[in-house]
UniProtKB/Swiss-Prot annotation:
Pfam families: MinC_C. This is Probable septum site-determining protein MinC. The keyword Metal-binding does not apply. Interacts with MinD and FtsZ. It comes from the Bacteria. Keywords: Cell cycle, Cell division, Septation. It comes from Rhizobium rhizogenes (strain K84 / ATCC BAA-868). Belongs to the MinC family. Cell division inhibitor that blocks the formation of polar Z ring septums. Rapidly oscillates between the poles of the cell to destabilize FtsZ filaments that have formed before they mature into polar Z rings. Prevents FtsZ polymerization. GO terms for biological process: cell morphogenesis; division septum assembly; regulation of cell septum assembly. The keyword Cell division applies. InterPro entries: CAP/MinC_C, MinC, MinC_C_sf, Septum_form_inhib_MinC_C.
């Protein structure tokens, strides 16, 4: 029996884009996972609830290695929503969807890093390390709900960081505007990292895993141009002249 659909309402299908964290692992995966664990330990809840895309572009791996990596990430509560740059031969049933055409967030001007792997005709084939970028500059304000994550070095924001936004840097953070959101410098263990901002109204600041919440900051520093640094296990702050 044929069922006739008489409901005049149509099914609405829309396309939307969402901000996702891109993880670009390096070989060997064991060493990369150690560095990831260190980041997660110093930034509690860092990956909790975040959409994550796994970029395996140009990595000489097979399906079993990819499945093992996804399983390791799952044990760390890192949920992979998609895989970019994977050869069709290494994908299989039960894996996250293959993605292509991804690009850096259009709101930001982030230097692109192309992975380089050189295969030599020698008994042991060793992939070269991906090129390291030491700093990035974001030339627009960072809006609520957005995240800038750059574990390789310093982050400079030519603008303000809204409440609910966050900056995570392996090095120092420079904000030429108001810091209302969260700023986490030295995320991979760089205790010498600093945070600089033109106007301090932060929800949270952290250096090398040491946190200070808004209510813990001296009242005389609120709304001021400030630099923050780590001294022992305490975050110190002073006004900028």
């Amino acid at each position: 029996m044929t069922k006739v659909i008489t409901d005049p309402r149509s099914i609405r299908i829309k396309g939307r884009s969402f901000l996702a964290v891109m993880l670009s692992p390096d070989l060997p995966f064991d060493n990369w996972l150690i560095r990831l664990d260190d980041l997660a330990a110093r930034s509690a809840g860092f990956f909790l609830g975040r959409p994550v895309v796994l970029d395996v572009t140009d990595l000489p791996i097979d399906r079993s290695q990819l499945k093992e990596l996804i399983a390791e990430l799952g044990q760390r509560n890192v949920s992979i929503m998609g895989i970019e740059g994977a050869r069709p031969s290494i994908l299989g049933p039960g894996m996250p969807a293959a993605l292509k055409g991804g690009r850096a967030v259009s709101d930001f001007e982030v230097p692109e890093k192309e992975p380089t792997i050189e295969l030599r005709s020698q008994p042991a084939t060793v992939p070269e390390a991906r090129p390291s970028v030491q700093s990035i500059t974001i030339r627009e304000p960072v809006r609520s709900g957005q995240s800038v994550i750059f574990p390789e070095g310093d982050v400079t924001v030519v603008g303000s960081v809204a409440s609910g936004a966050e900056i995570v840097a392996g090095g120092s953070i420079h904000i030429y505007g108001t810091l209302r959101g969260r700023a986490m410098a030295g995320s991979l263990g760089k205790a010498s990292a600093h945070i600089f901002c033109r106007k301090l109204e932060a929800e949270l600041v952290a250096i090398d895993g040491i946190y200070k919440m808004a209510e813990d900051m001296p009242a005389n520093l609120r709304g001021q141009a400030v630099q923050l640094w780590l001294e022992g296990d305490a975050i110190k702050a002073e006004k900028l002249i």
